[in-house]
């Protein structure tokens, strides 16, 4: 498994959340569960590295190698 091949998008925002998507290489994408969204422990175990607080909130069914994450925007 090569975590170096994982692509992390820039963050994008709305009023409530910041978002990012993560694109996995095919060998790692095979390890993504098909029946549920992943917990932080699960996505870390397949090599995804990002700061704490990100939630795997949606699947993009046509492209299961793309993981969609969000986290609550905190007041400044």
Swiss-Prot record:
ATP-binding is among the record's keywords: no
SUPFAM superfamilies referenced in this protein's UniProt entry, alphabetically: Cell cycle regulatory proteins
GO BP: cell division
Protein keywords: Cell cycle, Cell division
Molecular functions per Gene Ontology: cyclin-dependent protein serine/threonine kinase regulator activity
Self-association and partners: Forms a homohexamer that can probably bind six kinase subunits.
PANTHER family: CYCLIN-DEPENDENT KINASES REGULATORY SUBUNIT/60S RIBOSOME SUBUNIT BIOGENESIS PROTEIN NIP7 (PTHR23415)
Family of the protein in this entry: Belongs to the CKS family.
Protein role: Binds to the catalytic subunit of the cyclin dependent kinases and is essential for their biological function.
Protein name in the entry: Cyclin-dependent kinases regulatory subunit
């Amino acid at each position: 498994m090569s975590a170096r091949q994982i692509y992390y998008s820039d963050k994008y925002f709305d009023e409530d959340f910041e978002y990012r998507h993560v694109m996995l290489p095919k060998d790692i994408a095979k390890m993504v569960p098909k029946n549920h969204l992943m917990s932080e422990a699960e996505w870390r175990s397949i090599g995804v590295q990002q700061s704490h607080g990100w939630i795997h909130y949606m699947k993009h069914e046509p492209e299961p190698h793309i993981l969609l994450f969000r986290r609550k925007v905190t007041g400044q």
